[in-house]
From Swiss-Prot:
Lineage of origin: Bacteria, Pseudomonadati, Rhodothermota, Rhodothermia, Rhodothermales
GO molecular function: ATP binding; pantoate-beta-alanine ligase activity
Recorded family membership: Belongs to the pantothenate synthetase family.
Function: Catalyzes the condensation of pantoate with beta-alanine in an ATP-dependent reaction via a pantoyl-adenylate intermediate.
Major localization listed first in the record, in broad terms: cytoplasm
Residues that bind ATP: G154, R155, K156, D157, V183, Q191, S192, S193, R194
Subunit composition and interactions: Homodimer.
Additional free-text comment from the UniProt record: The reaction proceeds by a bi uni uni bi ping pong mechanism.
GO cellular component, one term: cytosol
Protein's name in the database: Pantothenate synthetase
């Protein structure tokens, strides 16, 4: 496996692989790799001949007061993990490499952004101003640097997954977006690099997120057609955790990410929650197909 630190080196390797007739896959990550990331890598290895994993803690997707400075970083550990999986390249650029004009005194950048509108109005986007603009901008840069045929993302970050699908469609990228189901701990908690912030009591209570989205799925599959009823089922589960500070519990259309009041048979919806335990913010969700109306 090659460790590549510059865009030029990454593009050169991608061009060489393409010249050999290989298909290319990209797995973008923030690093601090866990089993959830490795599921994405394994999927990429099945999708393409040549796999690149990017490791880059992107500053533009973190807002004021968020955990950019404290976000876990373990470049050498990530390198060893990826080498063991026979990944072809690890692309780990510096901030200066990805945002070359950030410190330009005359005209500091970036001046060019990629922004997918409307899809960031609810869920996480309503509370993390500028987050998804940072995500779509850096992913566009990674697409240009790594030149993939396939890009693999986790469906745990459901809003991001839907937004990136629309990004590729609207900007005519010849790239397939592949979504991988959420990887969970044995007790259901979605795997996340931020789980390590939790103290033992918070970690025990954090399972209410999975309980909440499971309750939403059961309510919908059981015939509940009022979004209010589904949200109520989630809130009942979240209330079992005394230290949980619920940011949102919502049901939206899975494609438009707009809120729904009444669930329509055949519609795909997304039930999602975001919860703080102290300073640690966790998310979870489930995509659910609304069943046919019962006769």
């Amino acid at each position: 496996m090659e460790l590549l630190r510059t865009v030029d080196a990454m593009q050169a390797q991608a061009d060489a692989a393409r010249a050999e007739g290989q298909t290319l896959a990209l797995v973008p990550t923030l690093g601090a790799l866990h089993e959830g990331h490795l599921a994405l890598v394994r999927r990429a290895l099945n999708e393409a001949d040549h796999v690149t994993v990017s490791v880059f803690v992107n500053p533009t997707q973190f807002g004021p007061g968020e955990d950019y400075d404290d976000y876990p970083r373990d470049l050498e550990g990530d390198r060893e993990t990826l080498e063991a999986l026979d990944v072809d390249a690890m692309f780990a650029p510096s901030v200066e490499e990805m945002y070359p004009y950030a410190d330009d005194e005359a005209l500091p950048g970036p001046l060019a952004w990629v922004d997918v509108e409307r899809l960031d109005e609810h869920l996480c986007g309503a509370y993390r101003e500028g987050h998804f603009r940072g995500v779509t901008t850096v992913v566009t840069k990674l697409f240009h640097a790594c030149k993939p045929d396939v890009a693999v993302f986790g469906r745990k970050d459901a809003q991001q997954y839907v937004i990136l699908q629309r990004l590729v469609e609207d900007l005519l990228f010849d790239i397939e977006i592949v979504g991988v189901p959420t990887v969970r701990e044995p007790d259901g908690l979605a795997q996340s690099s931020r789980n390590e912030y939790l103290d033992p009591e918070e970690r025990e209570q954090a399972t209410v997120l999975y309980a909440a989205v499971t309750a939403a799925e059961e309510a919908i599959e059981g015939g509940e057609q009022a979004a209010e009823g589904v949200v109520g089922a989630m809130e009942n589960e979240l209330a079992a955790a005394p230290d949980a500070d619920v940011q949102y519990a919502e049901v939206v259309d899975a494609h438009t990410l707009q809120p729904v009041d009444h669930l329509v048979p055949g519609q795909e919806v997304l039930a999602a929650v975001a919860v703080f335990f102290g300073e640690t913010r966790l998310i979870d969700n489930t995509f659910v197909q609304v069943p046919p109306a019962q006769a």
